[in-house]
Design a protein with these regions (language model features):
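Helix-to-loop junctions at the C-terminal end of transmembrane segments
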Residues: 51-65
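Hydrophobic core of transmembrane alpha-helices in multi-pass small-molecule transporters
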Residues: 12, 80, 94-115
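Helix-loop boundary and gating motifs at the non-cytosolic
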Residues: 1-49
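Residue-level signature of mid-helix packing/kink "hotspots" within the transmembrane helices
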Residues: 46-54, 149
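Single conserved hydrophobic/aromatic residue that forms the stacking wall/gate
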Residues: 153-157, 161-165
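Cytoplasmic membrane-interface "Motif A"-like loop-to-helix N-cap segments
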Residues: 62-75
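Cytoplasmic helix-loop-helix junction between adjacent transmembrane helices
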Residues: 105-140
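C-terminal ends and interior cores of transmembrane alpha-helices
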Residues: 75-93
Length: 165
């Protein structure tokens, strides 16, 4: 498989993950009675984005290759998001804000740095393949946006149908 195809798949999946929860989270929080905390959940993404990419960037530059750190970060974020999902499914409408917020915060603390790490991995791979990153990367990156949009449409479709009926 060519490097471009692999990077297209990586970007598609990178942003499909984000689209899967970003736009539907507010509706979920309203449904479980945590509507007054929606802003805190969304703000946490910005807060962790201020320092976690720098921290993991330093780790990637000094000790762990970016590809391995990207994998570790995605896996760890997925574990915490799965734990948050499992917690939400088992508690139903009796979700505790502190527990859900902690699991979500830990998930985004590991997910948000993957945005920069995936770009670093892509640029390094393109350089190693002898390709011009300025010309080659933008058409690859657009598949991240496509992944985000398709994911949010797929996830929000049942919600949209519930509102219509």
């Amino acid at each position: 498989m060519s490097i471009k195809i692999r990077l297209i798949i990586m970007n598609f999946l990178q942003f499909a993950v984000w689209g899967a929860y970003l736009t539907s989270m507010g509706s979920y929080l309203v449904n479980v009675g945590l509507h007054e905390h929606i802003g805190m959940f969304y703000a946490m993404q910005g807060i962790v984005s201020l320092f976690m990419p720098a921290v993991l960037g330093i780790i990637a530059d000094r000790w762990i290759p970016a590809q391995k750190l990207l994998s570790f970060s995605h896996f760890t974020a997925a574990l915490f998001m799965a734990a948050a999902g499992y917690y939400g499914m088992t508690k139903g409408a009796e979700v505790d804000f502190g527990t859900l917020f902690t699991l979500y915060s830990l998930s985004v603390a590991f997910y948000m740095p993957t945005l920069a790490l995936s770009n670093s991995v892509a640029y390094t791979a393109l350089d190693k393949a002898g390709l011009d990153t300025i010309r080659t990367f933008p058409p690859i990156r657009i598949f991240g946006t496509i992944g985000f949009i398709l994911s949010l449409i797929h996830i929000s479709e049942p919600t949209r149908l519930d509102v219509i009926s």
